Every structure is written in C-alpha cells, then in structure tokens.
Amino acid sequence: MKKITLSLSLLALSAILIQCTPAQPETQEAVAETVVEEQAEDSRILPSWNDGRHRDRILDFVARVTDTSSVEYVAPDQRFAVFDNDGTLWSEQPIYFQLYFALDRAELLGIEHPEVALEGGYGPLLDLFALTHTAMTAREFDGIVTAWLDTAKHPETNKHFTDMVYQPMLELLDYLRANEFETWIVSGGGIDFMRPWTQKVYGIPPQQVIGSSVQTIFENTGDGPAIRRLGKVDFVDDKEGKPVGIQRHIGRIPILAVGNSDGDLQMLQYTASNELTNMQVYIHHTDSVREWAYDKDSHIGEFHKGYEYALDNDWIIVDMEKDWATIYPE
C-alpha cells in the first residue's frame, strides 16, 4: 500500500513539474516573433526618417510622455507641440515663399520694381507687404492666397509651393496627433497667409496657427459684416515674439518645439522651461542636392546662436542629409 501511495505521489509530482516547466524552444520562438513584430511596427513609424539616434530619441520621448505608468507621463490636455513653418515644415529658399506671393501681387497691382524691397531692409519690406497684403477684407485676402497657391510655382524647382513641404515632418505631425498631441504652427510668417491652407496641407486647423499680423477693424459693408485689413503691423511673431504669441493663443507652455533658425531659439528655450518632460528639435539644412544647405551665414534661416545653444543643451539637431530618406512628398 505504501509503495502504491509513493508511486502515485511521484506521478503527481512529475505531472506538476511538467506543467510548470516552460517550453524553452517555444518561448524563445515567441520572443523572437515578438521582437520581429515590434521592429516591423517601429519601421512603419516615421518611415521617411532614417534609423538613428535622432529618430530613436523622438520615439522614446513620445513613449515616455504617453505611458500612464511612467513618472514622465503628460496628460493629453498638456501635450502641446509647436512648429515653425518656414524652413521647418516647408522650404524657405532662396526667399521666403510669402515674399514670392508679395512680388506676384505687386506685379498684378502694377507696382514697379517691387524686387528692390528685397535689398532695402526691413522698412521697404513692410511697405511692400502693406501694398500687397492690406486694403481688403480678411475674406478677400483668404481667397487671393488660395488662388495664388493653386497656380504659383517655385522658380527653381517648378513645384507648387505646397508640394515643397517636408515629408518627414508630415509624418511627425501625424505621429504626434496619433498620440494625442495638439500640433500648432508658430511662425514669423503672416498668420492670415498661412491659415487658408494649413488644414489641407498639414492637418493643422486655422485656429492653431500663430503668426505675424496686421491691424484689423470690423465694419459693415454692402456684403455684410467684415474684417478689414489695415496697413499697419499689429504683431511680429519672431524671436522673442514667439513665446509671447504662444502665451496669447495657447496659454500653456508646450512640451515639444521644432524650429530651424535663430529666430526659433526663444520658442525652444520657452519650451525647455516647462516643468513637464519636454523636447527641443532643430532642423539643420545640410542637403545641397535635394534641397539647400545653409546655416550661420545664410540671409534666410540663419542658424548660428541656436546651433551653439542646442549643442550645449543636448537638443536634437536633425541633419537633413543624413536623417531624412526623403525630402518632399512623392
């Protein structure tokens, strides 16, 4: 009887051990499959970005601030990401695209030699903008901008200006919004020049666009109530103006800021002051073949002080030539 009982006990113990012992080969295969799946999933995120430290840091940042179990978690209602436009979301060489618009408008209006304003400094440029951007209603200006973008092409690339947006940045915008970030434009360009098309091109609605502006007034016209654009500057959203514009329109300090020039430095510094986990990214124009290469000596998008500051503070400096597999959408 004791022998039978002992045998049964040994059988029971063997069964328990068999059930509890992990199937090593199957477990290793499962782990390998999981790794492959994760790598495949990761490759579908930001596909126009080459693998490397900069892409990894961006993905890691988003993972940390969206992980509810992390001490660095940031609630969705505080996930604000701000982007410069010229040179950050679309190209800006050899002159800002809005200047092409102003020159075309000047020709249409019969203004002689408007190109002289490009060499005359800040004052003549303001005069050119006053002549070409004002003395009309906001609705009229909206229509003029839209019609121009439908037909105008860049003189060097022969592309429509809205086809000269950066594919990697479009992917980054989509990726952030998929992770419940609110994406904003904070640009030195005209706020009313950008608003007609940012929703279609970037997925950023007009109410999430901050830019430079002219003074406006309300009036009743024969066509009904309207906002009229005046020939005086109201706000310049550049350099120190960018944090001011962010406070006026957003009312919160962002946790992510992306720019490309010294004019964006204060916006990135302001974002770095957030007590929440934050990130600063600079886009460095290094690709003379697929776009333009320029930085500290450029008349457009000068990148000198910002570059040195970014190095000192371990901010991301994206190298367009090395980090981006594609520049423009195909």
What is each PLM-predicted segment?
Residues 71-75:
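Short loop/turn motifs at secondary-structure junctions and domain boundaries
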Residues 76-94, 268:
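Asp-based phosphoryl-transfer active-site loop
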Residues 16-19:
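C-terminal motif of bacterial Sec signal peptides marking the signal peptidase cleavage site
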Residues 94-95, 100-163, 167, 171:
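A metal-dependent, Asp-based hydrolase signature
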Residues 24-45, 49, 56-59, 63, ...:
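C-terminal cap/substrate-recognition subdomain and adjoining C-terminal extension
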Residues 6-13:
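Sec-dependent N-terminal signal peptides
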Residues 64-70:
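A short, compositionally biased domain-edge/stem linker segment
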Residues 1-4:
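Positively charged n-region of N-terminal signal peptides that target proteins for export
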